[in-house]
Amino acid sequence: MASVSLYRRVLPSPPAIDFASQEGKKIFVEALGQGTMEGFFKLISFYQTQSEPAYCGLATLSVVLNALAIDPGRKWKGPWRWFDDSMLDCCEPLEKVKVQGITFGKVACLARCNGAKVEAFRSNESTVSDFRNRVISCCSSEDRHAIVSYHRSGLKQTGEGHFSPLGGYHAERDMVLILDVTRYKYPPHWVPVTLLWNAMNTIDRATGLQRGYMIISKLNRAPSILYTLSCRHEGWSSVAKFLTENVPLLLKSEDLKDIQEVLSVVFKSPPSELREFITWIAEVRRQEDGNLTLSEEEKGRLVIKAEILEKIRTAGLFKHVTSWLDSQRSRCSTIANLQDKDMLPELAARVCCQGACLLTGCCLSGGKCCCQIDVKHLNVDSKNLATTFVSGTFTTGSSSEQGVDVLVPLCQRGPEGHYIAMHPSTADVLTVLLLALPLHTWSGIKEEKLRAEVTSLVTTEDLPSLLQEEVILYMEPVLQFF
């Protein structure tokens, strides 16, 4: 049986001008001289074709994230960390995207989930003049890139909703360069700004909301955070749904008398995947001839992590969480099981195994891959500050050994010379998770005084700036765009 196949489409011109045409080249040279093609070179270096017909949003974001040199923090293939559209699964299952495509809000969620700063504007929240000014700003810089969501019919093209990055701007012609990620269909092309704006100023039938554009840049902060919401775990959506939808209903349905009862409602029957939902960001390195030293960069990161931990543990909410956890020790529950994983050697054994996998590109399936776990302390300065090294050995498939160190946030020595551990614990995790929940989560608490008390404990406005960043920049976005 014969099947229908297509080889590309003829680019409707006008209104578009093929980038590779003589006129397209002329526009490029002129725009280059105007200084509004600065972002083009980074984008074109990582320009790719979407791997599935409905992956335009994923491929567009993958191009931009790689152009911004954002580290995905996980492997693509072999030992290499690299963004590919098949890896962008933290806000929508890939199988669903493959069939239905992806919406504007979910692409913004994906960008934030993968470490980018996002300024998203639907067409009803902006003007064509604002859009033009932001595009000019992006195209004059290597550090910011614009993604547009538009309906193809507005450009006389076949198809419906589409995402693409913008690669440049020409002032006299008022045209932008669309780097179309469906390269099997249309080549990169220049289009008038006003025409593209009209194509963006349309309704997405899937959501009933306007399309628009977003400006993507790299977060201006070193990767020294303690926690992240592990939205890549298979059960992350059920946990996010429980926290954002079920918890508010549970709080509204019960007569609660104190904060301990509130915490019981939130954590008494969470999905089992909660254990994997919030993750400690550990730092792992190869062992260097048994030499326990820290670079200034390593010291700086560990100091920040220790400061964040200290801010968490001095927060009023932390004291309530600790008290509640103490009351749960005699019970067998998901949260109680979490506490079993709090011991530093057990934590670090898992981490050193994962780290060795990344460092060597060789992982064992099942079994214990780290042995000879050894906890050591190293003085950093004269203020009794020390860091903790947990050293482990990883045996590869060829029976060769690789030593790895897990660097634990700085700790202090107590009055009797004992080190006070500063590694993240269950109480820290739950405190940060509660702070990341939307404020309206608690609005259903019936008792007014209790509701006010809980709200004051979880409000992030009065938190120290380091802890605010930990919650607002790295935790809230995933829950916000669920």
From Swiss-Prot:
Keywords: Acyltransferase, Cadmium, Metal-binding, Transferase. Requires cadmium for activity. The active site is at C56, H162, D180. Gene3D superfamilies: Phytochelatin synthase, N-terminal domain. Induction: By cadmium. Its EC number is 2.3.2.15. One of its GO terms (biological process) is cellular detoxification of cadmium ion. GO terms for molecular function: glutathione gamma-glutamylcysteinyltransferase activity; metal ion binding. Expressed in roots, nodules and leaves. InterPro entries: Papain-like_cys_pep_sf, PCS-like, PCS_N, PCS_N_sf, Phytochelatin_synthase_C. It catalyses: [Glu(-Cys)](n)-Gly + glutathione + H(+) = [Glu(-Cys)](n+1)-Gly + glycine. The keyword Transferase applies. Pfam families: Phytochelatin (PF05023), Phytochelatin_C (PF09328). It comes from the Eukaryota. Signal peptide: none annotated. Residues 1-221 form the Peptidase C83 domain. Belongs to the phytochelatin synthase family. Involved in the synthesis of phytochelatins (PC) and homophytochelatins (hPC), the heavy-metal-binding peptides of plants. This is Glutathione gamma-glutamylcysteinyltransferase 2. The gene is PCS2.
